Amino acid sequence: LGTLAAVLRPINANIPNFDELSLPADQLMRWSQRSSGLVLICGPTGAGKSTTLAAILGQLNQTTQRHIITLENPIEYLFVPENCWFSQREIGTDTPSFAVGLRAALRQSPDIILLGEIRDSETAITALQASETGHLVLATLHSANTTDALERLTNLFPAAERNFALSLLASELLGIFSQKLLPSTKDTLIPAYEILSNEGAVSDWLRDLDLAAITEHVHRSGVDGNVSLLTCLAHLCAEELVTPEVAEAYCDRPGELRRLLRGIE
């Protein structure tokens, strides 16, 4: 008490790739190579969301020619142009808020906008409108899983704008990638993730905000590129990358995970 303290987060100067992070490159890049739409990277604080976004932009920098504007608080990774042109903006230094920075970015001819965090209704609506007008928006959101992300995002919208926002979300959302970092058997951290792709009937469920149907759809892993957290955790256990005890601690359906692991054994 009464003394100075600091919390330090070391940031690697090198942009990590998907293999180094044990992330599913195919799905993430399938979304990120689209010319427009909204991609949400979700998870709790410290789950590696910024690093996942950095890996996506690093891959795009090697393979495509795009103008990428980032809005971050704070800037973590510095991108060196290879094939892409980067304009990095820090909240509080270069622009007063995410919403103001996002509106300004739309006048700067971006192909891709990285939005460090969606925190309020103005930012959320503007992100959806940016997607609608031909931009790819990559954004983070604090949430426990894919359906929790949808609920939190929807709750940002005022009641009078909710139907309009849900209609935009149904047409512009490409997918949600939700992740958690788990202690692995190799004394490192490894991501466990859940994937929801906006394909098939998902857009109708989004328009009606039918979270029960979306949750059930996600748990049918393998359908339209979806992966449930349960399936991902079971795979990590089968590969002996995490222990069953750790997997259960991070699973929202531990009973189902135990039954699934018994089937694998």
List each model region and its residues.
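Short, flexible helix-loop junctions that flank or precede catalytic/ligand sites
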Residues: L1-E265
